[in-house]
Curated annotation (Swiss-Prot):
Keywords: Ribonucleoprotein, Ribosomal protein. GO terms for cellular component: cytosolic large ribosomal subunit. The lineage of its organism: Bacteria, Pseudomonadati, Campylobacterota, Epsilonproteobacteria, Campylobacterales. PANTHER family: 54S RIBOSOMAL PROTEIN BL35M, LARGE RIBOSOMAL SUBUNIT PROTEIN BL35M. It comes from Sulfurimonas denitrificans (strain ATCC 33889 / DSM 1251). InterPro entries: Ribosomal_bL35 (IPR001706), Ribosomal_bL35-like (IPR021137), Ribosomal_bL35_CS (IPR018265), Ribosomal_bL35_sf (IPR037229). One of its GO terms (biological process) is translation. Pfam families: Ribosomal_L35p. The keyword Ribosomal protein applies. This is Large ribosomal subunit protein bL35. Belongs to the bacterial ribosomal protein bL35 family. The keyword Cytoplasm does not apply.
Amino acid sequence: MPKMKSVKGAVKRFKVKKNGTVKRGTAFRSHILTKQDPQTRTTQHKSKIIAKVDEKNVKAMIN
């Protein structure tokens, strides 16, 4: 049986941390940021952690 291919879009978007949780980037960061509150802009710099419900599916797509 052939190997499962990883979903390349998921590989580019998600990273698995050492403790097993999955990191993702924040949405709404590409352009037209002048309308956003400065506090919102600074909090969006940080990466977010995926919910436990979605973790299994994302890890399957990556591996």
